[in-house]
């Protein structure tokens, strides 16, 4: 069974974090909420989120790390040395994945210096494109380049989560139909 760590920090965007957790858990993917700021965090819209665990070296055992955006959440994720070190390791492993949405492609991936030469999307504006100047910036809703998956922001969180299911080898069509995505 594949395993996923959805990272959170104070100021993380709750839609982006919890949508991914919800969709993956519906498909019975082992998905843990892993905090860099203690068991309980306040999201970007002041919602308390209780993590399953706090980051430690076991983070390296997951198959995928998901980085939600949000300000200052993305900056708080980028300041965690163990997370940045792990992202660098994952970036060169074919069977490990890094998924980032909203501000995190620009803020966290650039901090790890793993965006160079990749096709990457992120939240538009706010100087994020400038942080991604070593990458090829796209406006796709979800962008996949090798083992790095990126997306735009809160409105694309469902598409992002479904793409992560597909990449992990699960059937996103079945889950999306159960969630009535086909009605949109």
Please state what every model-predicted region is:
Residues 143-148:
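Beta-strand-turn-beta hairpins that frame and shape the catalytic cleft
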Residues 1-96, 106-111, 116, 127-139, ...:
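Extended, subdomain-level signal for the structured scaffold at the beginning of enzyme domains
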Residues 120:
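Anionic-ligand binding patches
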